[in-house]
Amino acid sequence: MKRWSTAVSLVFTLAAAGCALLPPPAQTQDVKTLSDQTDISRRAAIRLQLATQYLEAGQAATALDEVKNAIAIDPSVPGAYHIRALAYMSLGQHELADDSFRRALSTQPNDGDLLNNYGWFLCAQGGKPDQGMAMLRQAIEVPAVGSPSKPWTNLGVCQMRQGDLDGAEKSLTRATYIDANNPLTNLTLAQLHYKRRDYARAMSFIERVNGRGNPTAESLWLGARIARRLGDVSQQNAWSAQLQRRFPNAPEEAAFERGAWDD
Protein backbone atom coordinates (compact mmCIF):
# COMPACT_ATOMS: atom_id res chain seq x y z
CA MET A 1 0.00 0.00 0.00
CA LYS A 2 1.36 3.41 -0.89
CA ARG A 3 2.36 5.67 1.93
CA TRP A 4 -0.36 8.28 1.18
CA SER A 5 -3.06 5.61 1.11
CA THR A 6 -1.82 4.30 4.46
CA ALA A 7 -1.54 7.63 6.10
CA VAL A 8 -4.45 7.25 8.62
CA SER A 9 -5.79 9.75 11.11
CA LEU A 10 -5.11 8.77 14.73
CA VAL A 11 -7.13 11.45 16.49
CA PHE A 12 -9.27 10.43 19.43
CA THR A 13 -11.72 12.54 21.41
CA LEU A 14 -12.41 12.00 25.11
CA ALA A 15 -16.01 13.08 25.67
CA ALA A 16 -18.19 12.98 28.75
CA ALA A 17 -21.59 11.35 28.30
CA GLY A 18 -24.97 12.00 29.91
CA CYS A 19 -24.50 15.69 30.72
CA ALA A 20 -27.49 17.20 32.43
CA LEU A 21 -28.81 20.46 30.99
CA LEU A 22 -29.71 21.86 34.41
CA PRO A 23 -28.02 19.98 37.26
CA PRO A 24 -29.55 20.21 40.75
CA PRO A 25 -28.23 23.24 42.69
CA ALA A 26 -26.80 21.08 45.46
CA GLN A 27 -24.47 19.30 43.04
CA THR A 28 -21.32 20.67 41.52
CA GLN A 29 -19.83 19.57 38.19
CA ASP A 30 -16.36 20.11 36.86
CA VAL A 31 -14.48 19.47 33.65
CA LYS A 32 -12.66 16.15 33.69
CA THR A 33 -8.88 16.61 33.54
CA LEU A 34 -5.82 14.36 33.83
CA SER A 35 -5.90 14.73 37.61
CA ASP A 36 -9.29 12.98 37.64
CA GLN A 37 -7.89 9.88 35.95
CA THR A 38 -7.35 6.79 38.04
CA ASP A 39 -3.91 5.25 38.10
CA ILE A 40 -5.21 2.40 35.96
CA SER A 41 -6.71 4.62 33.28
CA ARG A 42 -3.59 6.80 33.25
CA ARG A 43 -1.28 3.84 32.73
CA ALA A 44 -3.52 2.48 29.98
CA ALA A 45 -3.61 5.86 28.25
CA ILE A 46 0.20 6.07 28.29
CA ARG A 47 0.46 2.61 26.72
CA LEU A 48 -2.07 3.60 24.06
CA GLN A 49 -0.15 6.78 23.29
CA LEU A 50 3.00 4.70 22.81
CA ALA A 51 1.08 2.33 20.53
CA THR A 52 -0.08 5.26 18.42
CA GLN A 53 3.46 6.61 18.11
CA TYR A 54 4.83 3.22 17.08
CA LEU A 55 2.07 2.81 14.51
CA GLU A 56 2.76 6.23 13.01
CA ALA A 57 6.45 5.25 12.81
CA GLY A 58 5.57 2.11 10.84
CA GLN A 59 6.33 -0.30 13.70
CA ALA A 60 3.01 -2.12 13.67
CA ALA A 61 4.13 -5.20 15.63
CA THR A 62 5.48 -3.08 18.49
CA ALA A 63 2.33 -0.95 18.36
CA LEU A 64 0.25 -4.09 18.69
CA ASP A 65 2.17 -5.15 21.80
CA GLU A 66 1.58 -1.76 23.40
CA VAL A 67 -2.13 -1.64 22.61
CA LYS A 68 -2.52 -5.16 24.02
CA ASN A 69 -0.86 -3.91 27.20
CA ALA A 70 -3.25 -0.94 27.29
CA ILE A 71 -6.29 -3.19 26.94
CA ALA A 72 -4.96 -5.57 29.60
CA ILE A 73 -4.64 -2.65 32.01
CA ASP A 74 -8.00 -1.07 31.16
CA PRO A 75 -10.28 -2.69 28.53
CA SER A 76 -12.37 0.49 28.37
CA VAL A 77 -9.52 2.85 27.41
CA PRO A 78 -10.92 5.06 24.60
CA GLY A 79 -9.65 4.28 21.12
CA ALA A 80 -7.81 1.07 22.00
CA TYR A 81 -9.68 -1.26 19.66
CA HIS A 82 -9.40 1.27 16.84
CA ILE A 83 -5.61 1.35 17.22
CA ARG A 84 -5.53 -2.44 17.49
CA ALA A 85 -7.51 -2.68 14.26
CA LEU A 86 -5.06 -0.39 12.47
CA ALA A 87 -2.11 -2.42 13.76
CA TYR A 88 -3.65 -5.68 12.55
CA MET A 89 -4.50 -3.98 9.24
CA SER A 90 -0.87 -2.93 8.80
CA LEU A 91 0.25 -6.48 9.54
CA GLY A 92 -2.16 -7.95 6.99
CA GLN A 93 -4.20 -9.78 9.64
CA HIS A 94 -7.54 -9.14 7.97
CA GLU A 95 -9.88 -11.17 10.18
CA LEU A 96 -8.36 -9.82 13.38
CA ALA A 97 -8.49 -6.28 12.01
CA ASP A 98 -12.14 -6.68 11.08
CA ASP A 99 -13.00 -8.01 14.55
CA SER A 100 -11.23 -5.07 16.23
CA PHE A 101 -12.93 -2.55 13.95
CA ARG A 102 -16.30 -4.05 14.87
CA ARG A 103 -15.54 -3.86 18.58
CA ALA A 104 -14.44 -0.26 18.24
CA LEU A 105 -17.54 0.63 16.24
CA SER A 106 -19.82 -0.91 18.87
CA THR A 107 -18.73 1.77 21.35
CA GLN A 108 -17.98 4.63 18.92
CA PRO A 109 -20.58 4.36 16.14
CA ASN A 110 -20.31 8.02 15.15
CA ASP A 111 -16.53 8.42 15.18
CA GLY A 112 -15.59 9.92 11.80
CA ASP A 113 -12.01 8.60 11.85
CA LEU A 114 -13.17 5.11 12.75
CA LEU A 115 -15.85 5.03 10.04
CA ASN A 116 -13.33 6.29 7.49
CA ASN A 117 -10.63 3.79 8.44
CA TYR A 118 -13.00 0.82 8.64
CA GLY A 119 -14.59 1.79 5.33
CA TRP A 120 -11.18 1.99 3.69
CA PHE A 121 -10.20 -1.36 5.20
CA LEU A 122 -13.32 -3.02 3.79
CA CYS A 123 -12.56 -1.56 0.35
CA ALA A 124 -8.83 -2.18 0.26
CA GLN A 125 -8.28 -5.36 2.28
CA GLY A 126 -11.57 -6.72 3.57
CA GLY A 127 -12.97 -7.77 0.21
CA LYS A 128 -16.27 -5.97 0.83
CA PRO A 129 -16.17 -2.84 -1.34
CA ASP A 130 -19.92 -2.21 -1.28
CA GLN A 131 -19.99 -2.26 2.53
CA GLY A 132 -16.83 -0.17 2.59
CA MET A 133 -18.28 2.50 0.34
CA ALA A 134 -21.45 2.61 2.44
CA MET A 135 -19.36 3.15 5.56
CA LEU A 136 -17.29 5.85 3.87
CA ARG A 137 -20.52 7.66 3.02
CA GLN A 138 -21.39 7.52 6.72
CA ALA A 139 -17.97 8.98 7.50
CA ILE A 140 -18.68 11.85 5.12
CA GLU A 141 -21.69 12.76 7.27
CA VAL A 142 -19.58 12.89 10.45
CA PRO A 143 -16.11 13.88 9.22
CA ALA A 144 -13.21 14.00 11.62
CA VAL A 145 -12.02 17.42 12.68
CA GLY A 146 -9.04 18.41 10.54
CA SER A 147 -9.46 15.69 7.90
CA PRO A 148 -12.92 16.02 6.30
CA SER A 149 -11.54 15.31 2.81
CA LYS A 150 -10.27 11.80 3.66
CA PRO A 151 -13.53 9.85 3.32
CA TRP A 152 -14.26 11.59 0.00
CA THR A 153 -10.80 10.60 -1.28
CA ASN A 154 -11.06 7.03 -0.02
CA LEU A 155 -14.54 6.70 -1.53
CA GLY A 156 -13.19 7.93 -4.86
CA VAL A 157 -10.28 5.47 -4.78
CA CYS A 158 -12.66 2.63 -3.94
CA GLN A 159 -15.05 3.61 -6.74
CA MET A 160 -12.18 3.75 -9.19
CA ARG A 161 -11.05 0.27 -8.16
CA GLN A 162 -14.57 -0.92 -8.94
CA GLY A 163 -14.44 0.67 -12.39
CA ASP A 164 -16.85 3.51 -11.59
CA LEU A 165 -14.80 6.34 -13.08
CA ASP A 166 -17.68 8.82 -13.15
CA GLY A 167 -18.51 8.23 -9.49
CA ALA A 168 -14.83 8.36 -8.58
CA GLU A 169 -14.37 11.68 -10.34
CA LYS A 170 -17.30 13.20 -8.46
CA SER A 171 -16.03 12.00 -5.08
CA LEU A 172 -12.44 13.04 -5.72
CA THR A 173 -13.53 16.43 -6.99
CA ARG A 174 -15.48 16.96 -3.77
CA ALA A 175 -12.29 16.11 -1.88
CA THR A 176 -10.36 18.79 -3.80
CA TYR A 177 -12.92 21.40 -2.77
CA ILE A 178 -11.88 20.71 0.83
CA ASP A 179 -8.15 20.11 0.30
CA ALA A 180 -6.85 20.99 -3.16
CA ASN A 181 -3.29 19.89 -2.34
CA ASN A 182 -3.92 16.37 -1.03
CA PRO A 183 -1.37 14.19 -2.88
CA LEU A 184 -3.44 10.99 -2.90
CA THR A 185 -6.47 12.83 -4.28
CA ASN A 186 -4.45 14.46 -7.04
CA LEU A 187 -2.57 11.27 -7.88
CA THR A 188 -5.83 9.34 -8.20
CA LEU A 189 -7.40 12.04 -10.39
CA ALA A 190 -4.30 11.93 -12.61
CA GLN A 191 -4.67 8.15 -12.90
CA LEU A 192 -8.36 8.52 -13.68
CA HIS A 193 -7.80 10.99 -16.52
CA TYR A 194 -4.89 8.90 -17.81
CA LYS A 195 -7.27 5.95 -18.09
CA ARG A 196 -9.64 8.18 -20.05
CA ARG A 197 -6.74 9.30 -22.27
CA ASP A 198 -7.33 12.89 -21.25
CA TYR A 199 -3.62 13.51 -20.85
CA ALA A 200 -3.79 17.28 -20.52
CA ARG A 201 -6.08 17.04 -17.49
CA ALA A 202 -4.01 14.17 -16.10
CA MET A 203 -0.94 16.40 -16.33
CA SER A 204 -2.64 19.21 -14.42
CA PHE A 205 -3.18 16.88 -11.45
CA ILE A 206 0.15 15.04 -11.49
CA GLU A 207 1.98 18.38 -11.51
CA ARG A 208 0.36 19.15 -8.15
CA VAL A 209 1.99 16.02 -6.76
CA ASN A 210 5.41 15.98 -8.41
CA GLY A 211 5.88 19.73 -8.24
CA ARG A 212 5.62 19.99 -4.45
CA GLY A 213 8.93 18.40 -3.53
CA ASN A 214 7.78 15.03 -2.19
CA PRO A 215 6.86 12.77 -5.12
CA THR A 216 6.68 9.00 -4.93
CA ALA A 217 7.95 6.42 -7.39
CA GLU A 218 4.34 5.90 -8.48
CA SER A 219 3.70 9.58 -9.12
CA LEU A 220 6.99 10.11 -10.98
CA TRP A 221 6.41 7.12 -13.25
CA LEU A 222 2.86 8.18 -13.98
CA GLY A 223 4.04 11.74 -14.65
CA ALA A 224 6.72 10.53 -17.07
CA ARG A 225 4.16 8.42 -18.94
CA ILE A 226 1.73 11.35 -19.15
CA ALA A 227 4.48 13.63 -20.42
CA ARG A 228 5.42 11.04 -23.03
CA ARG A 229 1.81 10.93 -24.25
CA LEU A 230 1.82 14.71 -24.55
CA GLY A 231 5.13 14.73 -26.40
CA ASP A 232 6.83 16.70 -23.63
CA VAL A 233 10.25 15.08 -23.86
CA SER A 234 11.89 17.51 -21.43
CA GLN A 235 9.40 16.79 -18.63
CA GLN A 236 9.42 13.07 -19.40
CA ASN A 237 13.20 12.96 -19.04
CA ALA A 238 13.17 15.08 -15.88
CA TRP A 239 10.71 12.86 -14.03
CA SER A 240 12.37 9.69 -15.34
CA ALA A 241 15.72 10.91 -14.01
CA GLN A 242 14.17 11.64 -10.61
CA LEU A 243 12.66 8.17 -10.58
CA GLN A 244 16.05 6.57 -11.28
CA ARG A 245 17.87 8.72 -8.74
CA ARG A 246 15.42 8.64 -5.86
CA PHE A 247 13.85 5.18 -6.21
CA PRO A 248 16.42 2.87 -7.83
CA ASN A 249 14.84 -0.29 -6.38
CA ALA A 250 11.18 0.55 -6.96
CA PRO A 251 8.98 -1.55 -9.29
CA GLU A 252 8.22 1.63 -11.21
CA GLU A 253 11.93 2.15 -11.93
CA ALA A 254 12.14 -1.45 -13.15
CA ALA A 255 9.19 -0.75 -15.46
CA PHE A 256 11.04 2.29 -16.79
CA GLU A 257 14.15 0.20 -17.47
CA ARG A 258 12.00 -2.32 -19.38
CA GLY A 259 10.47 0.47 -21.42
CA ALA A 260 6.99 -0.54 -20.23
CA TRP A 261 5.43 2.80 -21.10
CA ASP A 262 2.05 1.36 -22.05
CA ASP A 263 1.54 -1.16 -19.22
What would you call each of these model-derived segments?
Residues 58-65, 91-103, 127-138, 162-174, ...:
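Structural signature of tandem alpha-helical TPR/SEL1-like repeats
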Residues 43, 77, 111, 146-148, ...:
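Residue-level recognition of tetratricopeptide repeat
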Residues 39, 73, 107-108, 142-144, ...:
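Structural marker of alpha-solenoid helical repeat scaffolds
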Residues 23-35, 211-263:
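Terminal, low-structured helical/coil segments at or just beyond the last alpha-helical repeat
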Residues 80, 114, 149-151, 185, ...:
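TPR alpha-solenoid repeat register
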Residues 19-68, 72-74, 256-263:
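N-terminal leader/linker segments that initiate helical-solenoid repeat arrays
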